């Protein structure tokens, strides 16, 4: 005797394939389950993700929220004294332009902060107001 709890869905391999276009009594005859006219009836049609039948989709009906300030933010980069030792010679001038030319900073960078890490062996000339020195670097420069 078969009990309800033992019934199972046939696995995809055993499931009967849908025969299309084989007469009206099959349930999938004539238009082969595609309906009459419209995008879905055409060959090669795939419904786009989020498509809602021509109406304005949900992702366009819902208002956008918030504001990103990223476009307008000033780009600030950090450089260590250790790195400056390897890039500049003694008595050289340090400015945003020289840092950009030597590809130390990105070309869109508008400010640089110099951080104390290791010793600064060379005496450098700080030209640009956009280059900010940390307290540790300021005290190091005064001692040199």
UniProtKB/Swiss-Prot annotation:
Organism in which the protein naturally occurs: Chlamydia muridarum (strain MoPn / Nigg)
Gene Ontology CC terms: cytosolic large ribosomal subunit
Quaternary organization: Part of the 50S ribosomal subunit.
InterPro entries reported for this sequence: Ribosomal_uL15 (IPR030878), Ribosomal_uL15/eL18_sf (IPR036227), Ribosomal_uL15_bac-type (IPR005749)
GO terms for biological process, alphabetical: translation
Keyword RNA-binding on entry: yes
Lineage summary: Bacteria, Pseudomonadati, Chlamydiota, Chlamydiia, Chlamydiales
Entry keyword set: Ribonucleoprotein, Ribosomal protein, RNA-binding, rRNA-binding
Protein name: Large ribosomal subunit protein uL15
Alphabetized NCBIfam families for the sequence: rplO_bact (TIGR01071)
């Amino acid at each position: 005797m078969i009990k309800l709890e033992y019934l199972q869905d046939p696995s995809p391999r055993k499931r009967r394939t849908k025969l299309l276009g084989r007469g009206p009594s099959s349930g999938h005859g004539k238009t082969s389950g595609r309906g009459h006219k419209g995008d879905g009836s055409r060959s090669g049609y795939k419904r786009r993700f989020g498509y809602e039948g021509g109406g304005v989709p949900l992702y366009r009906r819902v208002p956008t929220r918030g504001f990103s300030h990223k476009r307008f933010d000033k780009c600030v980069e950090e450089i260590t004294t250790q790195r400056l030792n390897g890039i500049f010679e003694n008595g050289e001038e340090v400015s945003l332009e020289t840092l950009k030319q030597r590809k130390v900073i990105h070309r869109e960078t508008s400010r640089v902060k110099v951080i104390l890490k290791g010793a600064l062996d060379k005496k450098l000339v700080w030209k640009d107001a956009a280059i900010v020195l940390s307290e540790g670097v300021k005290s190091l420069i005064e001692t040199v």
